[in-house]
Amino acid sequence: MDFQHRPGGKTGSGGVASSSESNRDRRERLRQLALETIDINKDPYFMKNHLGSYECKLCLTLHNNEGSYLAHTQGKKHQTNLARRAAKEAKEAPAQPAPEKVKVEVKKFVKIGRPGYKVTKQRDSEMGQQSLLFQIDYPEIAEGIMPRHRFMSAYEQRIEPPDRRWQYLLMAAEPYETIAFKVPSREIDKAEGKFWTHWNRETKQFFLQFHFKMEKPPAPPSLPAGPPGVKRPPPPLMNGLPPRPPLPESLPPPPPGGLPLPPMPPTGPAPSGPPGPPQLPPPAPGVHPPAPVVHPPASGVHPPAPGVHPPAPGVHPPAPGVHPPTSGVHPPAPGVHPPAPGVHPPAPGVHPPAPGVHPPAPGVHPPPSAGVHPQAPGVHPAAPAVHPQAPGVHPPAPGMHPQAPGVHPQPPGVHPSAPGVHPQPPGVHPSNPGVHPPTPMPPMLRPPLPSEGPGNIPPPPPTN
């Protein structure tokens, strides 16, 4: 047989297999696959005869090899005969009874009654969880028996109509009757320490406690409101610092007339120092405050304020907040505008009073007015600078400016004038702010001052 010149052949290789060879190879391959899944020795219908061939006892067919028999078992004829045989056997076989369910034997014992119990309602002070504590007494419990419990739904019991708002906690122990407690149908907290049971064998008491889960987060605890007039305890310190004072509910209304707002009271701790003089409330718009009465000192000398160095003998610092005037030029009083250019000032020593202002009574000193007075036209205020002091002279207090040249210091025993008040000539009392002092009176025409005693009256001038 020529294998070299067949169509489809390749030089140096075998020829193309015939159809018979391909079928044989296919059957062998299927037999190997069938033997891997089917154990032919366990087939009840497989039989090998004395001729060495194989027979099918169900279909009565003859097969030359195992592959042929395995192919037969997968065919339609063999499958049909298997179904027919199974139906026949099922018809002829007797009906077998269904397997019985396992029955649980109910213990039968003589019940002696209900046990004693005690229920305690509890509430956790920290978390606010509600809990129930049950104490059941079983003094005559059977030997080797431990009480048992379980939760029962309202739909499992047959004693009351079912209500989903409630559930039942059952307690059982021989020979006592089973008792049940009706509790709210809420979720039980099974966390560690929230659900526990204990059986005391000595006292024959059974304890059970469970907590309900929190439905809402606990609200922060609030201090109870005490009776009126009783102050609450101060709040705890945070980081070692006291809490801030509460802010005012509403700001004070603005003053009428467009006046500036009064300063807010300080919120911090009060300064450690001597209390100052009492301050009067601001006057209403258009109303002038009464002038305070100033009594002369007993000895004529006042001690200096705390924190202020006394000046050297013969040197007095000027009043705080007062700029030294230029030599020969007096600044106008507060509230009086400087004259316009081209208008001659009044005669020296004669000052007309302001409209609506009456001259003060003798012996009445006006209150000091703080502030800086405007200068006359063409006069420049002194620059805010500090001049070196002479040896042995203490520097002035903060806010005080040195005096200009030509201004003589006050003699010892005379106090500096108040802020914003210019010194007056001897024997003349200062007037109210905005009013120029009157013309000095002759020595014999002015009344004696209170500080001048009977022996301090100056002698009359000599007559010609």
Curated annotation (Swiss-Prot):
Residues 1-27, 217-464 are annotated as: Disordered. Component of the 17S U2 SnRNP complex of the spliceosome, a large ribonucleoprotein complex that removes introns from transcribed pre-mRNAs. The 17S U2 SnRNP complex (1) directly participates in early spliceosome assembly and (2) mediates recognition of the intron branch site during pre-mRNA splicing by promoting the selection of the pre-mRNA branch-site adenosine, the nucleophile for the first step of splicing. It comes from the Eukaryota. The modification N6-acetyllysine is found at K10. Keywords: Acetylation, Metal-binding, mRNA processing, mRNA splicing, Nucleus, Phosphoprotein, Repeat, Spliceosome, Zinc, Zinc-finger. Residues 217-295, 303-323, 331-369, 435-464 have a biased composition (Pro residues). This is Splicing factor 3A subunit 2. PANTHER family: SPLICING FACTOR 3A SUBUNIT 2. One of its GO terms (cellular component) is nucleus. Belongs to the SF3A2 family. Component of the 17S U2 SnRNP complex, a ribonucleoprotein complex that contains small nuclear RNA (snRNA) U2 and a number of specific proteins. Part of the SF3A subcomplex of the 17S U2 SnRNP complex which is composed of three subunits; SF3A3/SAP61, SF3A2/SAP62 and SF3A1/SAP114. SF3A associates with the splicing factor SF3B and a 12S RNA unit to form the mature 17S U2 small nuclear ribonucleoprotein complex (17S U2 snRNP). Identified in the spliceosome 'E' complex, a precursor of the spliceosome 'A' complex. Identified in the spliceosome 'A' and 'B' complexes. It holds the Pfam family SF3A2. It is found in: Nucleus. GO terms for biological process: mRNA 3'-splice site recognition; mRNA processing; mRNA splicing, via spliceosome; positive regulation of neuron projection development; spliceosomal complex assembly; U2-type prespliceosome assembly. Its main location: nucleus. A zinc finger (Matrin-type) spans 54-84. GO terms for molecular function: RNA binding; zinc ion binding. InterPro entries: Matrin/U1-C_Znf_C2H2 (IPR000690), Matrin/U1-like-C_Znf_C2H2 (IPR003604), SF3A2 (IPR052092), SF3A2_dom (IPR031781), Znf_C2H2_sf (IPR036236), Znf_C2H2_type (IPR013087). Residues 370-392 have a biased composition (Low complexity). The modification Phosphoserine is found at S153. The modification N-acetylmethionine is found at M1.
